[in-house]
Design a protein with these regions (language model features):
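N-proximal low-complexity "stem/linker" segments adjacent to membrane-targeting elements
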Residues: 1-29, 36, 320
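Acceptor/aglycone-binding surface of glycosyltransferases and processive sugar-polymer synthases
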Residues: 57, 64-72, 76-86, 91, ...
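Hydrophobic helical membrane-anchoring modules
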Residues: 2-3, 176, 180-320
Length: 320
């Protein structure tokens, strides 16, 4: 195997019983000729169709297969995070278990990674998905992510990606953030590129994606943009807003004082209420900013709560 870096293939699995054996055969066919040490980490995300039994049979036959079973269905992002934690090699490749991603593209992704990039993201340029329910929402979401993140990829939702381990270790995932891994990597200084990959129609099982996921993606994108800019300095947001309100409030106070003391106009005007509202809002915003600073500092000084809980693991060096 020489000095070639090892590969960890991480696959979240949710009710893909009929796809697992042909998928593992294709992975073996694609990875064997590379001459690299490798492992295939399957993460069962609460499957109820017998997928775990199929995975155990695969692991019993092939020492490259390592299994992680979550206690219930936590979602794709926690499942991928569990796979990252239990993987061991310097290069990590992710793909779906539905046979729509093609394992034959893995060697190309790894070769593109080389010494020049930290993330190589797959681009399903010619997708085999329904236009209305999958392609249209995907195009809209990808456009918004490109514009808001500044990362010029075409297909953030493609699970087939190759990463250097150190980049994965530098980011934290929650919600539906797995699709933003290239964005997070770029924001921490990672070098990201894109490579066209094959995409096949689903022939077995049912899709876990739908229109509701687009809404979640957009909410996560807005949250991510806010957190990336202000998570370590919340007082820049609340403090700036508070100071602006206080400045306008004092300006309104000057106008009111001029009307009363110079012009002798004693009647109540809406400007008085606007002044009070601005001064109160500005003061409260400053206090909220100070409290947010304290909370954020405490948060970064403590260990984060995990987004998943493992029921059992199986494979080499693991208890079955």
């Amino acid at each position: 195997m020489g000095g070639l870096e090892g590969l960890s293939i991480v696959l979240p699995v949710l009710n893909e019983r009929d796809n697992l054996e042909p998928l593992h055969a294709r992975l073996t066919e694609a990875l064997g000729p590379l001459g690299r040490p490798y492992e295939v980490v399957y993460v069962d995300d609460g499957s109820t169709d017998g997928s775990w039994d199929v995975l155990k049979r695969l692991a019993a036959k092939d020492a490259h297969a390592r299994l992680v079973r979550l206690r219930r269905n936590f979602g794709q992002t926690p499942a991928l995070t569990a796979g990252f934690v239990h993987s061991r090699h310097p290069i990590v490749v992710t793909l779906d278990a539905d046979l729509q991603n093609d394992p034959r593209d893995i060697p190309r992704l790894v070769a593109a990674l080389g010494d020049s990039y930290d993330v190589v993201s797959g681009w399903r340029r010619h997708r085999s998905d329904p236009w209305l329910t999958r392609l249209l929402p995907s195009h809209v979401a990808n456009y918004l992510i490109r514009k808001l993140s500044g990362v010029p990829l075409h297909d953030f939702g493609c699970t087939l990606k190759a990463y250097r381990r150190e980049v994965i270790q530098d980011v934290s995932l929650y919600g539906e953030m797995h699709r933003f891994l290239p964005v997070l990597a770029a924001w921490v200084g990672g070098r990201v590129c894109e490579l066209e990959v094959r995409h096949h129609p689903r022939t077995r099982g049912t899709s876990k994606y739908g229109l509701t996921r687009t809404y979640k993606v957009l909410v996560d994108l807005i949250t991510l943009k806010f957190i990336s800019g202000f998570s370590t300095r919340p007082n820049y947001v609340f403090g700036g807003f508070g100071l602006a309100n206080l400045a306008l409030g004092f300006l309104a106070f000057d106008v009111v004082a001029y009307r009363v003391l110079v012009l002798r106009h004693y009647e109540a005007t809406p400007l008085v209420f606007v002044m009070m509202l601005l001064l109160i809002t500005g003061t409260l915003s400053l206090f909220i900013g100070f409290l947010a600073e304290i909370v954020i500092r405490g948060f970064y000084d403590t260990q984060r709560k995990p987004t998943y809980y493992v029921r059992e693991t199986a494979g080499p060096d693991e208890e079955p």
